[in-house]
């Protein structure tokens, strides 16, 4: 079984549906199936707006910057998933993804966002991407996805619109090359 947890999946150009030009960070991969978060499709909802919609007490010491909530995938689109650097804080529903990263689905992590108690780096997603047993492996064999080691700079710090090209460049691929490969094929 291939080891995909903690890796990026890069959508091949022929994926023309929800996953067109996406990068997915894989949070879980085992015999039962796979789950990940699209990291480069921002919604029009900022983290600050999400925070206020959830009716958390807005405190003066909260700063959110320009971070947006991303559309993590077409499954459970009403649920929040927070991918973050590991912390000393114990959140209620946290799953360790890698040595450095965890995913939390409980509101207690949201309560810390924008404060000094927040994880050092985090990505807030609504929805996730999931595959049944063997489904993702088949899609990879069918050349729907490229797999590459993840990179914290791409995951947390890079502008959303640059993440697809940057993930491809981890493999030495310029996305323009895909367009050339499609010429003459119908």
Swiss-Prot record:
SUPFAM superfamilies: VC0467-like. GO terms for cellular component: cytosol. Signal peptide: none annotated. InterPro entries: AlgH-like. Pfam families: DUF179 (PF02622). Belongs to the UPF0301 (AlgH) family. This is UPF0301 protein NTHI0415. It comes from Haemophilus influenzae (strain 86-028NP). The lineage of its organism: Bacteria, Pseudomonadati, Pseudomonadota, Gammaproteobacteria, Pasteurellales.
